[in-house]
Curated annotation (Swiss-Prot):
Keyword set, alphabetical order: Cytoplasm, DNA-binding, GTP-binding, Nucleotide-binding, Phosphoprotein, Repressor, Transcription, Transcription regulation
Gene3D superfamilies, per database record: 3.30.450.40, Winged helix-like DNA-binding domain superfamily/Winged helix DNA-binding domain (1.10.10.10)
Residues with the Phosphoserine modification: 215
Protein name in UniProt: Global transcriptional regulator CodY
Family membership noted in the UniProt record: Belongs to the CodY family.
Known partners and oligomeric status: Homodimer. Homotetramer. May form homodimers under conditions in which energy sources are sufficient (active state) and homotetramers under insufficient nutrient conditions (inactive state).
Comment field on protein domains: Modular protein made up of an N-terminal effector binding GAF-type domain and a C-terminal wHTH DNA binding domain, separated by a helical linker.
Region GAF domain, residue ranges: 1-155
A family per Pfam: CodY
PANTHER family from the UniProt entry: GLOBAL TRANSCRIPTIONAL REGULATOR CODY, GTP-SENSING TRANSCRIPTIONAL PLEIOTROPIC REPRESSOR CODY
Coiled-coil region: none
InterPro entries: CodY (IPR014154), GAF-like_dom_sf (IPR029016), GTP_trans_reg_CodY_C (IPR013198), Transc_reg_CodY_N (IPR010312), WH-like_DNA-bd_sf (IPR036388), WH_DNA-bd_sf (IPR036390)
Description of activity control: Activity of CodY is modulated by interaction with two types of effectors: the branched-chain amino acids (BCAAs) leucine, isoleucine and valine, which are signals of the nutritional status of the cell, and GTP, which may signal the energetic status of the cell.
Length: 259
């Protein structure tokens, strides 16, 4: 397959996504096919975002690593020493993707490391490995193109996470601001009693102890539930089951107490 045809194959994957998130596993499979190498997309913290195997490596430690989808911390940190593409590293290199305990079996093993950079920061690393055949310029062009695509995708995911976090926080702040002073006081006591993200409590007991009416507690819970911040369910005489749905809620509640 010529370089142009291989590039088109990668482009076809992006075009088929049509604005939807690119699946790192599919991306790895395509890279594996066009570069003909084992492909590992590794995050900053060593999480295996995607991988594809072209040549099986029979090694228990490697199998466990793939099953856990996590690269060793020491190896992951060492990858940050590589700031530009390093190709055809042999099995004696500290950056080899082949198991060092079986060097004699993988004497022809070659590894190529491609930093994944986006927005001016290191986002991860693309690790390629194969036996025997050197990585040529065409392979490196495809690898660097792929790392750029992966970097853009990681940045997009990060932006979505930030947006979602801001949205969750805004929902919580609006829900809390809708509570009256007595309702807010009731909620503070409820979650003090709950001491976690979910549990069972008896509203009447809290009402008696704090000196507020039960209806204040009911109204406060209803407001939070309608905002999608919590879920509550009456269990009759046993009390009310409450579960926090928005992970920003307890953080914002804690801030109010400290202010």
């Amino acid at each position: 397959m010529e370089l142009l045809a291989k590039t088109r194959k990668l482009n076809a994957l992006l075009q088929s996504a049509a604005g939807k998130p690119v699946n790192f596993r599919e991306m790895s499979d395509t890279m594996c096919e066009v570069i003909e190498a084992n492909v590992f997309v590794v995050s900053r913290r060593g999480k295996l975002l995607g991988y594809a195997i072209h040549q099986q490596i029979e090694n228990e430690r490697m199998k466990q690593m793939l099953a856990e989808r996590q690269f060793p911390e020491e190896y992951t940190q060492s990858l940050f020493n590589i700031t530009e593409t390093s190709s055809n590293l042999d099995v004696n290199s500290a950056y080899t993707a082949f198991p060092v305990e079986n060097r004699e079996l993988f004497g022809q093993g070659l590894t190529t490391i491609v930093p994944i950079v986006g927005g001016g920061e290191r986002l991860g690393t693309l690790v390629l490995a194969r036996l025997g055949q050197e990585f040529l310029d065409d392979d490196l062009i495809l690898a660097e193109y792929s790392s750029t695509v992966v970097g853009m995708e990681i940045l997009r995911e990060k932006a979505e996470e930030i947006e979602e976090e801001a949205r969750s926080k805004a929902v919580v702040q609006m829900a809390i601001s809708s509570l009256s002073y007595s309702e807010l006081e009731a909620i503070e006591h409820i979650f003090e009693e709950l001491n976690g993200t979910e549990g069972l409590l008896v509203a009447s007991k809290i009402a008696d102890r704090v000196g507020i009416t039960r209806s204040v507690i009911v109204n406060a819970l209803r407001k939070l539930e309608s905002a999608g911040v919590i879920e509550s369910r009456s269990l009759g005489m046993k009390g009310t089951y409450i579960k926090v749905l928005n992970d920003k809620f307890l953080q914002e509640l804690a801030k109010l107490k400290t202010n």
